[in-house]
């Protein structure tokens, strides 16, 4: 399978989780990654700037109408839902909170699954609510790959547990093993080109 995007949902404990996964990805990592991290509406974005210093690949805040490109990590801006359009660009919404959250993981996952279908990898990491569980279910329904952090290794296990209860998942892994899986799937993409 040639995967075209990875979407990651993370909440409480997310900075530490991202510090474990993203810095291990090599410079030539090709699959674009889009992250919704539950953050406060007034966040200044420092959380991903910390990561940027540790990583080999470029991390940036997603922009309205921006085209999703390989080799990039995009993060949702505070206080906006991040959606993926059919032309593989971002759009923002200030619609109602979903699962008490804006940005919402479910909103990203559901729109991404409609665009990428079976070429999408959905990932749920540590967090303190059930956001992302229904979105991951939608990814599975559209033939995508579902990956969940092992709740036993999560800083807060509620979000991974909710995802596991909502749908059948392909992988339940530690953060280190998730990073290894990403690298392996990206290598498979290169070999299939």
Swiss-Prot record:
<keyword id="KW-0145">Chemotaxis</keyword>
<dbReference type="GO" id="GO:0050568">
    <property type="term" value="F:protein-glutamine glutaminase activity"/>
</dbReference>
<dbReference type="GO" id="GO:0006935">
    <property type="term" value="P:chemotaxis"/>
</dbReference>
<keyword id="KW-0963">Cytoplasm</keyword>
<comment type="similarity">
    <text>Belongs to the CheB family.</text>
</comment>
<feature type="active site">
    <location>
        <position position="131"/>
    </location>
</feature>
<feature type="active site">
    <location>
        <position position="11"/>
    </location>
</feature>
<dbReference type="InterPro" id="IPR035909">
    <property type="entry name" value="CheB_C"/>
</dbReference>
<comment type="function">
    <text>May be involved in chemotaxis.</text>
</comment>
<dbReference type="GO" id="GO:0008984">
    <property type="term" value="F:protein-glutamate methylesterase activity"/>
</dbReference>
<feature type="active site">
    <location>
        <position position="38"/>
    </location>
</feature>
<dbReference type="Pfam" id="PF01339">
    <property type="entry name" value="CheB_methylest"/>
</dbReference>
<dbReference type="GO" id="GO:0000156">
    <property type="term" value="F:phosphorelay response regulator activity"/>
</dbReference>
<dbReference type="GO" id="GO:0005737">
    <property type="term" value="C:cytoplasm"/>
</dbReference>
<protein>
    <recommendedName>
        <fullName>Putative protein-glutamate methylesterase/protein-glutamine glutaminase</fullName>
        <ecNumber>3.1.1.61</ecNumber>
        <ecNumber>3.5.1.44</ecNumber>
    </recommendedName>
</protein>
<dbReference type="InterPro" id="IPR000673">
    <property type="entry name" value="Sig_transdc_resp-reg_Me-estase"/>
</dbReference>
<keyword id="KW-0378">Hydrolase</keyword>
<feature type="domain" description="CheB-type methylesterase">
    <location>
        <begin position="1"/>
        <end position="189"/>
    </location>
</feature>
């Amino acid at each position: 399978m040639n995967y075209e995007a990875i979407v990651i949902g993370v909440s409480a404990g997310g900075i530490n989780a991202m510090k474990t996964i993203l810095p291990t990805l090599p410079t030539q990592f090709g699959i674009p990654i889009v992250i919704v991290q539950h953050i406060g509406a007034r966040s200044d974005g420092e959380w991903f700037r910390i990561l940027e210093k540790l990583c080999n690949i470029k991390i940036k805040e997603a922009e309205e109408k921006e085209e999703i490109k390989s080799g990039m990590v995009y993060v949702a801006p505070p206080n906006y839902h991040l959606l993926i359009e059919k032309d593989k660009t971002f759009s923002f919404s200030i619609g109602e909170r979903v699962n008490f959250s804006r940005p919402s993981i479910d909103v990203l996952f559901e729109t991404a699954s409609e665009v990428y279908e079976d070429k999408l990898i959905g990932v749920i990491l540590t967090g303190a609510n059930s956001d992302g569980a229904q979105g991951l279910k939608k990814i599975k329904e559209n033939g995508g790959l579902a990956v969940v952090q092992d709740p036993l290794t999560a800083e807060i296990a509620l979000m991974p547990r909710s995802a596991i209860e909502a749908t059948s998942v392909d992988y339940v892994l530690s953060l280190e093993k998730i990073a290894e899986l990403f690298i392996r799937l990206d290598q498979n993409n290169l070999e299939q080109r």
